[in-house]
Amino acid sequence: MKLPSVKDLNLVEKTVLFRADYDVPLGQDSRVVDVTRIEDSIPTLNYLFSQRAKVIGLAHLDRPGGKVVKGLSLKPVAEKLSLLLGKEVRLSAEVLGEKTKRAVKELKPKEILLLENLRFDAREMRNDKGFAKRLASLGEIYINNAFAVSHRQHVSIVGIPRYLPSAAGLDLVEEVETLTKVLQNPRRPVVVILGGVKYSKIEAARKMIGWADSILVGGKLVIYNGFPKLVKKEKVSGDLKRDGEDITEASIKEFEKIIRKAGTIIWSGPMGAFEKEEYNQGTKRIAQAVVKSRAYTVIGGGDTEAALTKFGLVDKIDYISSGGGAMLEFLAEGTLPGVEAIKKERQE
């Protein structure tokens, strides 16, 4: 899939709306615990600055439910981003209003203004047309670099591109190119490993049955109503211990056998409560089997990456996607709403 890239547009001294993925974990002191997602935005931002662009950063943090939550301000993100960039990152006092408009007008080339948490405004999640128009009016060009939320029908993902020339940031381009290769020309057999607690993965598994050679299911997914129907398919397997916190020894051995023969492995979600010593065997042994295999390995989702990091194996994975749900939806559908939005020409 060929995406319009940030490098395809004339950005010289343009005001650019830059959708980043800054949904990062904060500690009890409200400091950023993991800077990975912020670091991932730096190459695209540096390219924008090289074009003397005036940048308006768009991002969300957690799920404040459409209202202002002091502890979910993007202030810690702005501070960390400022350190990484080596320049001031101003934070707007609001998502959208007169103060924001004034701050945008004051922007000079190679400067950046980060708008406050978009999810403080309920219209973001509703994909409100009026809100999209008002945000779009702040800039001249829209760049999406937030793969992890590009499966969402939100204003900052699919609404703004209706009104502005749009393109993908460097991170989004890499994600889409990598996953497209995996989807269109994988080394077989393809083994998909799904775990965790999100029911949406059951639907993803259902859609991937025709593409994958084996689907291995663990975590809480096996107790959901949709799972028994999936198990009837010969490609799908999974079993949970009675305590509901890990997969059984029989499942571990079965999964290890399938993984050894894999040509491509896609993994999203742990096999159980890996944070607890007594429940980490399923996730740990599957992780060990994955990195020992000769397969091309792709993981997605914060818990999966955290588990592999805990077991000291994350560096042995071939590709780490920034999004679990977005990765699975892309592999199931071949695209994402946010990807389609920047491919389409402006509608209005």
What are these regions (language model features)?
Residues 1-348:
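Active-site loop-to-helix "anion-binding N-cap" substructures in soluble metabolic enzymes
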